Amino acid sequence: MTRDGKPCNVGQTPTKALGVTDQHSQLQLYTEGPYDKVITLIKVGAFRSTVEIPHGCEEFHDVAFLGGKTLNQLIEAERQGTEYALLKAGRMSQTITLPCVNAGTIGQLMYFFELTTAYEGELLNIDAFNQPGVETSKRATYAILGNTDAKYDAARKEMTGRPAFKPEYIL
């Protein structure tokens, strides 16, 4: 809800994707699904270590070319390939380059996303620091776990009074 009490059905939904692991489940959606996302790619300037991909699969043409390369190169090539696929599909993306991965750079990245969330809240006229939609779940969780504080009584009563699950609809 906006500060004026009007529905606001837009905003960020952070999701993570790990290279090729998530390409089939997410990249297809991002390139051919609804045009309602901005993708942020994270690039690492210097990895802590280098892992070489060994030779030894020459009989398998589809992977033989990887021998002698590093996992670092593979990760960066996957990022570039994803960036290219998004560009070719006309989808917005941004790349944030971390000089290295450590507590400091991860903290800076998290702070950056916190600031962008607060800024987006202002642009959409919503209070990014008040999440009433989350409170319902928290009250229900505390009630389920047996918190006897009176402020959870309503949630407990409402939940115990709801219709029973129908076994024929449960897989």
Regions found by a protein language model. Give the residues of each.
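A SIS-like phosphosugar-recognition module
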Residues: 1-171
